[in-house]
């Protein structure tokens, strides 16, 4: 009887340990938000794609506020992403989702509003060792006036091999990244043909 009770206690302890580990793994798929009432930023992660780790920089903007694309238009400042303090990271490739155009007193601007995720593809120096992604970001947010913003985030990616609730959002952001169009591609706006006349292409 005592042995049965001990087995039951052990089973309960094991179940609680598994639940706690799952909770920690789930929490590790996103860093805390860093920002203020106008905007905030965090890192999110998903499981790996082969040797590449998938993650994203998420910026959340308050209603009426916007931030900018890499080519901001007549006004504005593009975000600057710094991953230099990351651990065991060989390279980080950041993609820019398709932006929208805004017209205001400063002219035409190109950027984002609401919630935007910049997809990341990360290669580790040593895939057998944990990866810690560290971000510092400088960006601008604008309503009627533009103000500078900054943020930082840190996210260990070792637990990202597990399924993540961020996968649909990351997949949607990746789908918004413009794809290069080949000459003659009829599925999207593309150059159908090139003809050279003298020093000019027509």
Q: What spans do the regions from the language model cover?
A:
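Bacterial N-terminal signal peptides that target proteins for export
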Residues: 1-13, 23
């Amino acid at each position: 009887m005592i042995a049965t009770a001990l087995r039951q206690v052990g089973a309960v302890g094991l179940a609680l340990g598994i639940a706690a580990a799952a909770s920690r793994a789930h929490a590790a798929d996103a860093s805390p938000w860093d920002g203020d009432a106008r905007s905030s930023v965090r890192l999110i992660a998903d499981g790996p794609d082969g040797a590449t780790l998938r993650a994203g920089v998420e910026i959340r903007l308050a209603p009426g506020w916007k931030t900018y694309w890499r080519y901001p238009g007549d006004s504005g400042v593009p975000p600057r992403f710094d991953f230099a303090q990351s651990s065991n990271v060989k390279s980080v490739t950041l993609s820019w989702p398709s932006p929208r155009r805004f017209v205001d007193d400063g002219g035409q601007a190109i950027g984002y509003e609401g919630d935007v995720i910049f997809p990341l593809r990360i290669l580790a120096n040593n895939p057998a060792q944990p990866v810690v992604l560290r971000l510092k970001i400088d960006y601008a947010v604008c309503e009627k006036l533009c103000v500078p913003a900054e943020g930082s985030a840190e996210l260990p990616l070792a637990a990202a091999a597990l399924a993540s609730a961020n996968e649909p959002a990351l997949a949607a952001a990746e789908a918004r990244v413009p794809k290069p169009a080949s000459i003659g591609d009829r599925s999207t706006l593309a150059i159908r043909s090139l003809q050279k006349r003298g020093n000019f292409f027509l």
